Amino acid sequence: MDQEGQPLLSKDFQQVLLATASGNNSSWTERAVLNNESTDAVKHEPALGQNDVFDLDPLSFDKWVPFLRRALDKNQLDPVIDELENSIEDNFQGLELQLLQDSQMNDKLETSIDEIANIQGMVQDTLSSEISKFQIRLSESANELIVKKQMYVNNKKISLKISEATILITKVVRILELSSKCQELITERKFFKVLQNLDSLEKLYLQEFKNYNFQFLIEIYNSIPFLQKVTKDECINLIRNSLNLNLGKNLIKVGQEFVAIYENELLPQWLETRSKMKLTNFKFNSPIEISMRDESFLAKLNLGEFFQLDDFHDSIMIFQNLNELSVLSGEFNKEYELRKTKLMYPLIWKKNKTAAYQMDSLLRGTGTTPGSTAHDVSTDDPFTQSLSLHFLQDYFLKILGFLLYDINLNKATEFILVDNNYNSTNEFWDGLMDRLSPYLSYFIDEKLKTEEDMIKLKDFLCIYVAILENFKLNIEPLYKILVSIFEKFCSVSLRAFDDEFQILLNDDDFMPLSINDKTLYEKVLKICWMKEGEHLSLPDPTNGEPFAVTLPFSPLYPMTCTLAKKTYSKITAFLSIFYRHELHTLNNILVKTMDDIFNDIVNKKIRSKLESTSREEIAQILVNLDYFIIAAKEFSNFMTRENILQNPDMEIRLSSIKYLAESRKLAETKLIELIDSKISDILETIEIDWQITEVRQDPDISIIDLAQFLEMMFASTLQNLPYSVQTLLIFREFDSLTRQFMGLLLHDTPSTITHESIMNFEVDVNYLESIIPRIFPSTPGTIDSNGYQSPMTPSTPTFPNANGVDAPTLFENNIKSLEATFMELKQCIELLKTQGKDYNEPEIRLRKYSRIRQEDAALLLSKIQHFVSSVEGANGDDTSVMDSSSIFNSESASVIDSNTSRIAKFFNRR
């Protein structure tokens, strides 16, 4: 709005415009004069001067640019043009009048008008001529254009057809190339690419040539199903070849490599680690062992390094694309079943009504019929005839390789080929073991003989079980075989112990063990289990005394202890590295084995020796049995502490302890019977003259023999017996002896006896009583807490005090108790000596004859009184007296048996 009063053209711009106009006018005038001077120039170039009038000086135009640009920037170009036109009218308004008043200018104008008229005519002629020519040329060009256009259209149609033909030919060539490529790929065994090319070929044909009747293309298209079938057949053949490659000798190699890595790398590393870290309670393949394995060893167990399964991947993709995966699975299973059949050879199923089902179940990995019994093993079976340790190892290695292959194949193919049965490998393994177990049991029972072979088979199968366990396969059937091997090993160890013990028993001298070497003595003490608190008084080497010790047991005991410990160590070593399942079962087998050693072998074989008639041998057996009972108890304690279950609350007690104790009682009985028999034999030789009229001062020679026998027997032959047994025997024999003499006096004497014979009989009885202190040791030793006599040196047996009782007091009490056995007999003798003069007085009778029954007293008095009244008639009865003097008869024997209970009371007295 403010700009409306202001001129849009600045003074500077107006001056430029005016300067330009004046300059152009003068320039035009000069050129017009020059043109007039040259007629030819005007004639030939009439339009040139006219156009030059309107030419602008470029320099002048450049001067306009800043002003025009400014107007453009302000969007004022149109107003500037309008104002410019108005300015021209304003500036040149009086110019026409000025020109008319100028005569020179008028002349020039007239001349110019004529010239302009001439120029106009000339221009018209020229234009007409040019237009004619142009029309002719235009007509020619139009015709030419029409012709060329027609040619172009024709060419374009041809070109289009050529292009279409080219495309078609290209596609045909593509089909031919695909067909040819399929053939090449089939030859190269790249079947998945074959399928891709066939798919492309089919799509290309259906899209482009379905409506064409090209016979060769139709033939190519019709060959697609055939090529697909060829591809499928070749894939199946490829799988067969892959199975041939992987399931041949390669299986044993794979099994060997796996077992070798476990046996030669993982196991030695664990044994070293276990020893260093004192992890003896942990077994191989336990969680702690697995956690400590070297990763470099585990890297060698990558199944992908052992088996090539690329062919399976291609085949699965091919059949998946063809939607015929079930066909592949069926063909694969058929082929796989054949491989499994070859794999199991020479294992053959018995032909029975369930054989077909069992075979099918095994091959399919579904096990056997539920509830089916174990298969019988025939010695004519090829598998049975092939059984050997080497054969079984190779067979199991082959099976292991197959199991690993099956596991790897199923995982790599995502269990597609087994219908997503994730337990297929386990089912096959269980079915195989169900069939194989009877053969293994047969081999263990019948053909596995040596401990070396058992250890080899055990180590191999334990490594085998570890591998199966790490691959999550069922180890139960094979572990049962390992338990059977352990049972067989224990059985063989038991037989070996039996053989060696029999040799030891036959070589044993049944004499106390004398040792002259201190080192040997210390070894014996370490080997043997001794009685609690038992010790020896060893010679003092500083005094120059030779080392000499006699142990109460015979050499059989330490040798048996050594043999038992070695056997136990051997058996536990058999279990120490691998066995870590079913420990209760293994522990029961171990305990039973040791029980059998102590009972079925040691106890029964020693018990058979009790048929001996040697008192010394029976006595030594009794001593040995005492120590074997201790050994069995200590072995029970040892097995409790070291039990393989590692259970601190478990207590093991061998049942053989009871049977050994029974044998000990039997040995006591046998020893008593032998002593009784010997004493009875001696008593049969004793003859007492009851009619004698002379009194002798010395005992009868037969009484002296009897006393010497008793003294020798108790002081030497039976000196190593336990103190309780010695005491029992002493009391029993003296009680039996006094009762037999009592029976002799009451029932085996004639109706009349002389006073002198009574005096002589008293001398004999007093002599027998006098040996009592000599039978018991004069220097008491020590007795252990169980009442056993301690071992001794060859010279002197020792009798300890028991349960806190002073040994001398016990010694005195025993002598007094033993002397009391003669009391009744001595009272009878005293009654006969006094002829019963004071017997009728109650006070005296109770004091002097308390042990004599009234009927016995009456019987005795009748004999002595009868003798007094009929001395003369006594000589006629000598024969009857002699006939009745034998003291060993059935009545006296019954007296011995009836007094057993009373002997026990004597033994328990203090």
From Swiss-Prot:
The modification Phosphoserine is found at S286. One of its GO terms (molecular function) is small GTPase binding. GO terms for cellular component: cellular bud neck; cellular bud tip; exocyst; incipient cellular bud site; mating projection tip; plasma membrane; prospore membrane. It is found in: Cytoplasm; Cell membrane. Signal peptide: none annotated. GO terms for biological process: exocytosis; Golgi to plasma membrane transport; intracellular protein transport; vesicle docking involved in exocytosis; vesicle tethering involved in exocytosis. Residues 88-116 form a coiled coil. Keywords: Cell membrane, Coiled coil, Cytoplasm, Exocytosis, Membrane, Phosphoprotein, Protein transport, Transport. InterPro entries: EXOC6/Sec15, EXOC6/Sec15_C, EXOC6/Sec15_C_dom1, EXOC6_Sec15_N, EXOC6PINT-1/Sec15/Tip20_C_dom2. It is a peripheral membrane protein. Its main location: cytoplasm. The exocyst complex is composed of SEC3, SEC5, SEC6, SEC8, SEC10, SEC15, EXO70 and EXO84. Interacts with SEC4. Present with 4280 molecules/cell in log phase SD medium. Belongs to the SEC15 family. Component of the exocyst complex involved in the docking of exocytic vesicles with fusion sites on the plasma membrane. This is Exocyst complex component SEC15. It comes from Saccharomyces cerevisiae (strain ATCC 204508 / S288c). The gene is SEC15.
